[in-house]
Amino acid sequence: MNKNYSYPLDLSWSTEELASVLSFLNDVEKAYESKVSAQQLLGSYAVFKEVVPSKAEEKRIGREFESVSGYSLYRAVQAAKNTEKGMISLGK
């Protein structure tokens, strides 16, 4: 997939909020490109949900991110929830 894409970010977020969202999106990328700890991904998802508590907003960000990267936030989080412990890798 093209590595030159823009992240779906809200410019009204604080620097700390932007860092939290980017951390989660980076963990999703790791799940597809190599592997990531399920606990790490779930932890960054919990912090992401503090910044983006709305399900509708989460889905919008997920759709935008998947359209530019090919990586699904939903599938990554579900894989982490199903694994709970250990590493997840969604790459083909």
UniProtKB/Swiss-Prot annotation:
Per the record, the similarity remark reads: Belongs to the UPF0223 family.
Any one Pfam family here would be: UPF0223
Annotated HAMAP family? UPF0223 (MF_01041)
Please give the coiled-coil regions recorded for this protein: none
Name by which UniProt lists this protein = UPF0223 protein SGO_1052
Q: Which InterPro entries match?
A: BH2638-like_sf (IPR023324), UPF0223 (IPR007920)
Native organism: Streptococcus gordonii (strain Challis / ATCC 35105 / BCRC 15272 / CH1 / DL1 / V288)
